[in-house]
From Swiss-Prot:
The organism of origin for this protein: Homo sapiens
Compartments where found: Nucleus membrane; Mitochondrion membrane; Cytoplasm
Cleaved signal peptide residues: 1-40
Residues spanning the membrane: 133-151
Keywords, alphabetical: Cytoplasm, Membrane, Mitochondrion, Nucleus, Signal, Transmembrane, Transmembrane helix
Designated name of the protein: Taurine up-regulated 1 protein
Membrane topology, Cytoplasmic segments: 152-153
């Protein structure tokens, strides 16, 4: 039996900008990990004929679809069918993704050109910094965590 085509996948391109930290690692774990990613196969049948981990498989599939929808609503990614690049969605792509069941139409839009200014549905226009404005807090947290872990008992 022929293998079904892969689910829509995401391929990253950073361009010096940090991926939105609210979803970056979740997307990485859900979409790129070989066991949970876009190439994940359905579970094999157990010797008794029942699916060994059907519940887990359905949960992963549902969570992955929710991650796609959240990322598209945030304007971080576009869904591509057979490979491509991780880009901000063009105006028509949000509607196409919504028609495919990955998000609400019109929630991810592009505003402006030139300096790559774009607008979140819930926030101000962003520029090429793309989320790096608040990176100092994460540096402080990481530094304190390292101090805590390296302290002698």
């Amino acid at each position: 039996m022929a293998r079904p085509p892969p689910l829509p996948g995401l391929v990253g391109r950073r361009n010096g900008r940090a991926v939105d930290r609210a979803i970056g690692w979740r997307l990485f774990l859900l979409l790129w990990h070989p066991a949970l990613g876009a190439q994940a196969r359905p579970p094999r049948r157990a010797p008794g004929g029942r699916w060994r981990s059907r519940r887990v498989f359905l949960l992963v599939r549902r969570t992955r679809a929710a991650a796609y929808a959240f990322a598209i609503r945030r304007g971080v990614v576009r869904v591509v069918g057979g490979g491509g690049q991780l880009l901000r969605p063009a105006p028509g792509e949000a509607a196409a993704a919504a028609a495919a069941g990955f998000g609400a139409a019109g929630e991810a839009g592009v505003a402006g050109a030139g300096l790559e200014a774009w607008r979140h549905p819930s926030g101000p226009a962003r520029t090429q910094l793309g989320g790096q404005e608040g990176a100092g807090g994460w540096l402080v947290v990481g530094f304190l965590l390292c101090l805590f872990l390296l302290m002698p008992p």
